[in-house]
Amino acid sequence: MGDHIIRSLSVSGGIRILVCDVALLTREICRLHGASPTVSIALGRGLAGGALMGALLKPGQRLALKFEANGPLRKMIVEADSDGAVRASVANPTAEAEPLEGRWNVAGVLGRAGFLTVSKDLGLGGQPYQGTVQLCSSEIGDDLAYYLADSEQTPSAVGLGAALDEDGLISVCGGFLVQALPGVDEAERDRVTDNIASLPPLSSLLREGGTQKLLELLFDSVAYTRLETRELFFRCGCGREKVERALLSLGGAELWDMGTREGEARVTCEFCRQSYQFDADELKALAETATLTRIHEEHEHLQQ
């Protein structure tokens, strides 16, 4: 089975558990960014976390996770939507941090002082909902759990794991999201809490047993129902038209100056690294469009 997510619910309706495998898409995204080993692990955790939270969205909604801190990575953005599409960008893909007690030092490469901002486009045409919390550990999973408890008042446990092969490429990547829903049976909640504490290392568990084994261990003696298994995939969504709209926002004067002085412009997507080239004639045409649009908007404003 390729990258996927499984949504499940206890028979009592009080415990929701999601598990995911994002190894393939994480490997591709790390390749596109030329990510260092430690950044690859950070990206893997971020992508797994984004996929898990994206699975909670309603149709037509999307979210963005922005981690900003004082480490050499500086910033990581993960976006996910209700269809199962995810993408990510990092400010400094080659950043590194010395291992800490034999483990990947994700907190060291991201930075221990910083913030997590979650933006949700609810598909209603208004401003996105946004919530911000301080990073509590900079290990990604704990920070997402803290956000869910603090900003969305949903007690949650998030476990994320990733591992590299001998060539330094992602070989395993995934995780789980456990949430206690209103009216949860305390005995069931305590059993699942104990199950989480008893889990073997997550990357080893995913490698040997996959998401199904992870799900079984999380519920263990708690009866549950699998609600859905959904494909996850990397999709950027950028395109030349979107880049043109971004350039138009610069205004006619700046675009004309770029066309006459620079003679060209190259715009690279921060998520998929696709480059879009614009020559002098194309920049001048965009400048004329931007100028005409501004004149039209000013005229419309005067008519009101």
UniProtKB/Swiss-Prot annotation:
Single GO term (MF): unfolded protein binding
GO cellular component labels: cytoplasm
UniProt KW Cell wall biogenesis/degradation keyword: no
Keywords: Chaperone, Cytoplasm, Disulfide bond, Redox-active center, Zinc
The keyword Ligase is annotated on this UniProt entry: no
NCBIfam families recorded: PRK00114.1 (NF001033)
Protein family (similarity comment): Belongs to the HSP33 family.
The protein, known as: 33 kDa chaperonin
